[in-house]
């Protein structure tokens, strides 16, 4: 159904005479799957058992893992999937010229969102590749003079693994601790910078606890010490205002699927003045100014550009709406359940990412109980691990609370009804699971669990 609808929409987009655009889908309305609905809990295709009728999917509350494709983004992409399929690097015919023009328009849209020059935007396959290019590319280019990097203990796994890879090559890496709030101590950052430090990499918004780092202050420190500053902004671009010049950011990683764009595409901002030099990670045709060889996927970058344009237009509205829904979720859970802890700084925090720990409840058990709501206990990249979140451990959360954490994601298409349903089910199952917990029973009897000396058998 979805494929047939896509072909019909593409044909209309390419062949229809000019006229007024159809109205965008109204926020909060349930749309049919064939209409490319981003909303959760919509009927799924039932080709395997059509007689069974529509199957309801869970409500989607995991927007830090990925976001649904905005229908307006899909509309922008469709012509380049069907009719305008030329290679944007083919300079001898109209097919290539059309795709190149679309690619450069997308580059402008991405640059406009972060206050950059379009020539400073390099398209990649996503934030993971962008982070690798930034960290490994800068470190290797300046390795003859500078062999030291600085990052934090709460970065995304791809940043931490890139740094560990560089350590194996002989580089030195300082992993800054964070405070209980999840925010770094700027004095510790200043003290960690050495004469041979080439790069500082600190993420803008944490993907697990939503904490916002003081990016502008970090940028000023790095600029004054003549050290390049990279930020992984996958969870921040399009959600909070960012300006690479005002914040003195030298490199920035961007992801398409975290801002209601397609998966498989991202970008890296690399400053031109003063120029940041980067060693390319892959060899090939020298596309993207030699920094990222490989044919640029026109439909995907068009989608990324459209997502950035929509985000720029609606950022203020989205932020107010998401803040209101997030506050509703937090307050309604906390007023109904005792012993609930919000992880991370509540003030310096992106409201769409809420990480709560429910004492005396195992997080995995709660996730299984909440089968009607799509949630996670942390980063999607490490969700298969049963170990407690390294981010929560870094902010000093004890192991039991770290194991009991759930991340709630509120996004552009989340409705008030979905928030209320999630709250209702969460309260219901936390109470049920606590009633089954001997630890909860002991606490209700007034026993201090910390005073008990446990023995192994």
Swiss-Prot record:
EC top class, as a word: transferase
Q: Does the UniProt entry include the keyword Mitochondrion?
A: yes
Q: Where does pyridoxal 5'-phosphate bind?
A: 127-128, 235, 255, 257, 295
GO BP: any one term: [4Fe-4S] cluster assembly
An MF annotation (GO) of this entry: cysteine desulfurase activity
Instruction: Identify the residues that bind Zn(2+).
Output: 381
- Which Pfam families does UniProt cross-reference here? Aminotran_5
The protein's UniProt keywords, in alphabetical order, are: Cytoplasm, Cytoskeleton, Iron, Iron-sulfur, Metal-binding, Mitochondrion, Molybdenum cofactor biosynthesis, Nucleus, Pyridoxal phosphate, Transferase, Transit peptide, Zinc
| Keyword Phosphoprotein assigned | no
Q: Where does [2Fe-2S] cluster bind?
A: 381
Modification Cysteine persulfide occurs at: 381
| Residues at the catalytic site | 381 (cysteine persulfide intermediate)
Relay the activity regulation note: Active only in complex with LYRM4.
Gene Ontology CC: centrosome; cytosol; mitochondrial [2Fe-2S] assembly complex; mitochondrion; nucleus
List of residues that carry N6-(pyridoxal phosphate)lysine: 258
User: What's its EC?
Assistant: 2.8.1.7
What is the required cofactor set for this protein?
pyridoxal 5'-phosphate
Post-translational events = N-gluconoylated.
PANTHER family per the UniProt record, alphabetical: CYSTEINE DESULFURASE, CYSTEINE DESULFURYLASE FAMILY MEMBER
Family stated for the protein in its record: Belongs to the class-V pyridoxal-phosphate-dependent aminotransferase family. NifS/IscS subfamily.
State the protein's name: Cysteine desulfurase
Higher taxonomy: Eukaryota, Metazoa, Chordata, Craniata, Vertebrata
């Amino acid at each position: 159904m979805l494929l047939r609808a896509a072909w019909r929409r593409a044909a209309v987009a390419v062949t229809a005479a000019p006229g007024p655009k159809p109205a965008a889908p109204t926020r909060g309305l349930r749309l049919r799957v064939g209409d490319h609905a981003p909303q959760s809990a919509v009927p799924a295709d039932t080709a395997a058992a059509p007689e069974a009728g529509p199957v309801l999917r869970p409500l989607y509350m995991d927007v830090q893992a990925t976001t649904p494709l905005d229908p307006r983004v899909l509309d922008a992409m469709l012509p380049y999937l069907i009719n305008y399929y030329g290679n944007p690097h083919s300079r001898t015919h109209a097919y290539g010229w059309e795709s190149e023009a679309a690619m450069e328009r997308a580059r402008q849209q991405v640059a406009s969102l972060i206050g950059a020059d379009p020539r400073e935007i390099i398209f990649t396959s996503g934030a993971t590749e962008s982070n690798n290019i930034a960290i490994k590319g800068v470190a290797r280019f300046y390795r003859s003079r500078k062999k030291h990097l600085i990052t934090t203990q709460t970065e995304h796994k791809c940043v931490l693994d890139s740094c560990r890879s560089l350590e194996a090559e002989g580089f030195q890496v300082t992993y800054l601790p964070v405070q209980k709030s999840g925010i770094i101590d700027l004095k510790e950052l200043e003290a960690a910078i050495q004469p041979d430090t080439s790069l500082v990499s600190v993420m803008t918004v944490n993907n697990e606890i939503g904490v916002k780092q003081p990016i502008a202050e970090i940028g000023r420190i790095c600029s004054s010490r003549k050290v390049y500053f990279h930020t992984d902004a996958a969870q921040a671009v399009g959600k909070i205002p960012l300006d690479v010049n005002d914040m003195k950011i030298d490199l920035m990683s961007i992801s398409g699927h975290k801002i209601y764009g397609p998966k498989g595409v991202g970008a890296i901002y690399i400053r031109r003045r003063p120029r940041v030099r980067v060693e390319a990670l892959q060899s090939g045709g020298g596309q993207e100014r030699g920094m990222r060889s490989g044919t640029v996927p026109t439909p995907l970058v068009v989608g990324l550009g459209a997502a950035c344009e929509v985000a720029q237009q609606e950022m203020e509205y989205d932020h107010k709406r998401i803040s209101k829904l997030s506050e509703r979720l937090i307050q309604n859970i906390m007023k109904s359940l005792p012993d609930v802890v919000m992880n991370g700084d509540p003030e310096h925090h992106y409201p769409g990412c809420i990480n709560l720990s429910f004492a005396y409840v195992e997080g995995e058990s709660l996730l299984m109980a909440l089968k009607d709501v799509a949630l996670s206990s942390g980063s999607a990249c490490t969700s298969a691990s049963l170990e407690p979140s390294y981010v929560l451990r870094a902010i000093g959360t004890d192991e039991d609370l770290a194991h009991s954490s759930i991340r709630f994601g509120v996004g552009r298409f989340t409705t008030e009804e979905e928030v209320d349903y999630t709250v209702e089910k969460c309260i219901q199952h936390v109470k049920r699971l606590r009633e089954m917990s001997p630890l909860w029973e002991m606490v209700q009897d007034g026993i201090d669990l910390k005073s008990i000396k446990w023995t192994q058998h």
